[in-house]
Amino acid sequence: MSMPLLKLAVVGCNSAAGLLETLSELKLPLAAFYPLDRDDEGELVSFGGDDWPVLELADFDWKTADVAIFLAHTDAIADALAAGCKVVDASGGEPQRGAVPVPPVTDVLLARLLGAFKAAGDVQFAVGTGLLAVSQEGQAGIDKLSEQTRAIFAQQAVEVGTTYAKRIAFNVVPVAQEKAAASATKLAKKLGVPLSLQLAHVPVFYGHSLSITARFGAPVTADALTTAFTDTGGIYLLPSGTASSQDAIGGDQVWVSNLAVSDDGLSASAWAVVDNSKLTALLTLAALQAALEAR
């Protein structure tokens, strides 16, 4: 679909600066661009090869924009919808009626992997552990890892702050189990596969990783599993070696390696990595297209 020229507002342009940069690379057709944030009015952000001053969110007239992308959750979503804006919600907050949501990268990652396992055999249940890069939390996560790392090397006191429950530099911080369980329950219902999920924040700037194991109702072969993963859209099965989160940076596919089947053929496991920022940008673009097509 070719897009019309957009009068585009982006909310949370400072809190999600990394994602904004990736969105800029998609070269959206713009008639006007309005970078908005609750703070930092007057600061400059780069988008589409130009520098733009950040506008105060509270003072913005939503009738001047025809589409809005929310990278940060705010009650202004309701104001944008009321003014007739097409709204794409990439904030990860509670779904808003009338807004087109952007699915979380972890959900898309798990859906692709479970889809491949289901193509190989009758999946009874699956168990996964996801390792989340700090860019999951936007610029706040990137800044916190940078600050804490510098403080440790300088032998200074490390400020934990509010972004993570514990120090993130040189550490692994589990996500609250209630949040992980809620995500697993929602996905299990959607995909028809019981799922147990653990999530943790790791001191990596970009690139999510996931280890997943599936249990089958009948034995599967290594060949069948390889074929299923090779044929599943959005997955790149590494022919040999191991994929690291750095390998996936800049791409939109889920890289899979370490694909293994148990001796009895009743369980199989895989290691997967994905560029969370790039994939989120592409999912946001797809949501934007859906919003423009909606009446």
Annotate each PLM feature.
Residues N276-L282, A286-L292:
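Flexible, small-/acidic-enriched active-site or ligand-binding loops
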Residues H201-P203, V274-K278:
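Glycine-rich phosphate/pyrophosphate-binding beta-alpha loops
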Residues D61, E159-I249:
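Contiguous C-terminal substrate-recognition/catalytic subdomains in enzyme active sites
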Residues G130, P174, A214, N258-L259, ...:
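Hydrophobic side chains in beta-strands
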Residues A268-V274:
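Short, well-ordered beta-strand elements
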Residues S2-K166, G192-P194, A218, A222, ...:
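N-terminal Rossmann-like NAD(P) cofactor-binding subdomain of oxidoreductases
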Residues G128, I212-T213, T284:
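A structural motif
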Residues S209, G265-S267:
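A generic structural signal for beta-strand entry/edge sites
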